[in-house]
Amino acid sequence: KAYFEVAGIILRENVHMGVIYIQGEQLWGEKLPRLATIYLLVLKLIYDEQMQTASSSSHVVTTLGAVNGKAGEFHVLKSLPSITEMRRTIALLKKYQIIEPLDVLEELNEATRLVIYPCIHTVLLGDDIRELLATFSEEDQIGDEAAIQSTLEDMPE
């Protein structure tokens, strides 16, 4: 702990969630692609929903179809992402040990099972997620309205 404190980093342990993580003002990770951000938000919601039901396990299993379906419910995905984009996103989230695919990534489909680890709690709080999902929806609506307005302006009289 003292080693990290010299650099302004705090080592945190949450026994209840079963995670150890570092925190500090100087810590900035890489910028996540849009799909990774959407998946992260949706995975957190799925995790919270499934943990509300009496579960003795600390991790949750879901499918890629459920993740894409939930993203569709919140209108944050206009269409199904490409297989390549989904593979990259799953690999990125696996790199940070947020999820673990139970099936081979080369055979990616809607039935592909994903384990969501408890460390998803350290990424965002539930209320933050709902705000971000609303922001994604507003951005899409503004984009759609701008496209409609642009189309209307381009129409001959």
Language-model region placement:
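Eukaryotic partner-binding/assembly regions in large regulatory complexes
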Residues: 1-26
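Short, amphipathic alpha-helical interaction segments positioned at domain boundaries
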Residues: 115-152
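A short, conserved structural fragment
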Residues: 5-13, 90, 94-106
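Long, compositionally biased intrinsically disordered regions
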Residues: 155-157
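Accessory beta->alpha helical hairpin/"wing" motif in late/C-terminal subdomains of nucleic-acid enzymes
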Residues: 19-24, 100-127
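Short amphipathic alpha-helical interaction segments
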Residues: 1, 78-95
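Short acidic, hydrophobic short linear motifs in intrinsically disordered regions
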Residues: 54-72
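Positively charged, polyanion-binding regions of nucleic-acid-associated proteins
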Residues: 33-58
